[in-house]
Amino acid sequence: MEEGISQEVSLIERFTSSPSFPSAMIAFGATVALAESLLILIQGESIENAVWPQAVRTLSWTFALRESVTLIALFSALFLGFCVYSSFQNHRGRHLAKPLQAVFLGLIGAVLASWIIFVLMDYRYLRGAFLLLPTIYGVLLLGSALAIRGPPRLPDSSQNWKEKGATALHVLTIFLAAWLVMPGIPALIGIAPSPPTAPVMGYGAEPGPFDRTTVRYAYELPEEVTSIQGPTEEDIEFSIYLTLPHLPEEPGIEGVPLAILFHAFNNPSIDSYTDWIDHLSAKGMVVAYIQYPTDVRPEGGDDFDATIIEGTSDWPHHVPRMLSIQSALLRLNEIITATPRDGAIDDVLEDLIIMPEHLWIGGHSLGGAYSLQALGMVQSMGWGNETLLVDTEMAAARPVQEEWLPNYTDLPENSIVHLVVSEDDMTVSQCNSALHLDLFDEIEDNHSLLLFIPSDRYGFPRLVATHYLPANEAHDTLADWAFYRRVDAQADWVVAHSRGDLNTADFAYANLIDTGMLTNMGKWSDGVDVLPLQVYSNPSESNRFADCY
């Protein structure tokens, strides 16, 4: 027994004393950090899908880190203090114990691997929005490198080529760590200007004044859709989520208007859009969140070479999705016109009817494009023929298939259109929304607007306008000012017109057309204006969108 233990100890000692020990531990740390993404890649997913879970976690971590700057600064000081002390001890020949060396080497590998994933996510999703996470990576990398090898020094002639290589790598690691740390120092020491806080009253504040209840209604997908569904959404029972406002007793109105919201590609869960839904419904409207299948695999779709022109595309995948949305809208019409109506709705609305003639319709990304097609579908039912607000956020290219082309020649006088793009959207082209605006030529210019949300990296946290601004996962100060303020005003305008409340309608209207009330984004803590929204009624005449035409 003792001999076996002795042999095991001998093997461990030989491993920790071998030249391969540092590289093996660094590789182990990197493997642990990459394990989830590697597993997803092995399962046949794309690189984008492989890093997506970590992208979502990164958002969560970063929002938490923003609230803990003092703790981060304290941790960084203590960690670096210990590592600098260990560095001096190393320089005097007193090296760290092997288990502690293994921890620091593994940490170096994990940090380097995590940083590589962060770079990919930053290019694809984050666009420089987050400072503290790379700063922490830099602190961990700097401290670990100092603790393991001591202060950096240049290679000298007394070293062999392996030693020179290790010394050079150590110097490069220190430089990389310093480069990661430097941008975050103003935030850590508290000298970077902070953005405006979310409004505490009025548009953009907490959703209100009404509480909400959500009821789910499944709908049947057409057979030609179910036969080509992919596996990523096979566990979903596609449904309409109806969110109902709790109005006071005897509100003195006939009914409440309707909103229809569509989600982005590969993101049917309502959990990503509850903030958007709450801001709409809390103003006094019923919101129908429609799930539709995005993982559909029509024949020839895998190697289809799409033609994308004038904000449209001819992907064959559009057809089964349009059939699904059409089925959902027919089911929605059944729900709101049923006699008697479902008890779950009557329990909340009592005698109030749902009035789709006063309509808000919109969506995010692919859902934004499909909301334009859905508007064409519901016009035949008289929906949106008295009040209409269209809001697409970072819309994708819409279907070009003839059977789904909308015709907006008979929109009501009370129509407002917001087609919104963000500066650092790396997912869809801004030209889509610019070209979609041509669909609404019959609406007067000040009612049909292309809105451009700029990024402002002046202070900390940075305000970076990405593709994901409307999703719960990216709900930050920029979203409060650039997005949720507009959503509140949009809902207020539709609800006010449904009630004949012209005073409220006029106030909301002033927040929705090309005025300072729409474009104002508040001020940084040092008094500098946050970059305002940019409004275009004729984007073809602007330099920013000239390449789209």
List the predicted regions and their residue ranges.
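N-terminal cap/lid segment of alpha/beta-hydrolase-fold proteins
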Residues: 173, 183-254
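C-terminal catalytic histidine-bearing segment of alpha/beta-hydrolase fold enzymes
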Residues: 445-549
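The feature captures the conserved acid-bearing segment of alpha/beta-hydrolase catalytic domains
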Residues: 384-458
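Short beta-strand element of the alpha/beta-hydrolase
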Residues: 253-264, 278
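Alpha/beta-hydrolase active-site loop
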Residues: 305-352, 373
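Gly/Ala-rich beta-loop-alpha elbow adjacent to hydrolase catalytic centers
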Residues: 362-371
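Cytosolic-side transmembrane helix boundary signature
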Residues: 132-175
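Short amphipathic alpha-helix adjacent to the substrate-entry channel of hydrolases
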Residues: 271-289
